[in-house]
Amino acid sequence: MYEYCSVVIKKYSKYTIPSFAPNGFQSMLEPPQIDKWQHLSANCTLQFRVLLMDSRQILINVVLNNSTLLENIRLPLGDNQDLIQFSCKSPIISCKYISEEFGPRMLRRFQMNLPNDVEFNRTVVSLKNLNFVLRTARTSIAQSTITSQVQGNNNGTKVCFTEGPKVSSYTNPNTQFQTQNMIMDFSQRYQEESERESNNRSNITLPHDSIQIAQQIWPNTDLNVVQSSQDLNTPMATQTVLGRPESLIVQPLEVSQSPPNTTNCLPNAENKKKKVDTTSDFTSRKEIALCKTGLLETIHIPKERESQMQSVTGLDATPTIIWSPGKDNTAKKNTSNKKNIDDKLTNPQKSGNTHTPDRNKEVLPNGTLNETRKEASPSEGLTIRVKNVNRNASRKISKRLIKEKLKDEEFMKWVNKVETVLNKMFEK
């Protein structure tokens, strides 16, 4: 290993955020930002070294206090223009190189501020001899072409040197460059370029459709909704929109209050249904199941159905229907019983008792009513027992129920019959 060049530097600056460069130096890169640079200069010893290795490789180091490596770049000797490039402006040398240390290709930057022009020129010549790419850094557009005076130390003659976009060639190590207003930090140059781009982009008017306004709904408040959009290297654009929350509309859902039509029979029973009208409750029709001869079945109304009936009619009724077996002409007898009940309602004089039966009384299977025996006809095969009817319960009748009952013809006929009976009772 041979130390080809070693120079003490005055200031070291490093760009903290590497740029993703899949195409190397030909990639579209974001301009560096001035606040992303870190500087190191005070109370320390900094040294820039170029080492030649036996394996035809070059090692570039920046050493802190002769012990800590700030930069450690290993390159092959020869054509390195695709891996590392230098930009020079006395007394600053800037370097950018491609690193694949952590997988993807990243572009890293650092720069050095040399103590004087002599050290600057010696370092530039050493890099040029190793075939590194050296470019002249430009401070601004106005100074893209600058004429400087070059003073030679040997003969004292003045040579006119013109700086341009081409790669500069340095052949005389004793040459001193006398420049005026050319010393500028590269980070400051990048800041000027970013500000220039932001000023150019600020004049562009964006369409209103491209800005999406996010609205939040809160009750009884006016909100300032902020929508921000940020472009590359442009300041954040903030738009404040005054919005009012939308009113929340709640539509109540009507729940069907009709009880489920479910009946339970024995496994060997026939699944036939018959509707029987009763005068002891507002529900004039009940569905009962016809069972075979020799079987008795008690139909109990479930608690859920009772709660639904209470919410609709306001009555606490628990009817229990007992079906006694009969013959094939049971349907005809039931219709005759229905006609007898209707005749008693229309002609109260013919009936033995004009008063309506009490709902709290029980009709037993043998025909007794409150210990008063009443012979039940043998042809009657249906006995109905009604218990626990509370007339004082709070009635909850909805408009929907009233509309349905008014459309029910049978219910209206029953109401008319009850009205005629009551009128005749009051006339007496």
UniProtKB/Swiss-Prot annotation:
Interacts with MEI4, MER2 and REC104. Component of the MER2-MEI4-REC114 complex. This is Meiotic recombination protein REC114. It comes from Saccharomyces cerevisiae (strain ATCC 204508 / S288c) (Baker's yeast). GO terms for cellular component: condensed nuclear chromosome; nucleus. One of its GO terms (biological process) is reciprocal meiotic recombination. The keyword Nucleus applies. Residues 255-278, 307-380 are annotated as: Disordered. Required for the production of double-strand breaks (DSBs) in meiotic recombination initiation; not required for mitosis. Plays a role in activation of the DSB nuclease SPO11 at recombination hotspots. Prevents accumulation of meiotic double strand break intermediates and is needed for the proper timing of the first meiotic division. Component of the MER2-MEI4-REC114 complex which seems to be required for meiotic double-strand break (DSB) formation. Residues 255-266, 346-355 have a biased composition (Polar residues). InterPro entries: Meiotic_Rec114. Keywords: Chromosome, DNA recombination, Meiosis, Nucleus. The keyword Nucleus applies. It is found in: Nucleus; Chromosome. It holds the Pfam family Meiotic_rec114. Belongs to the REC114 family.
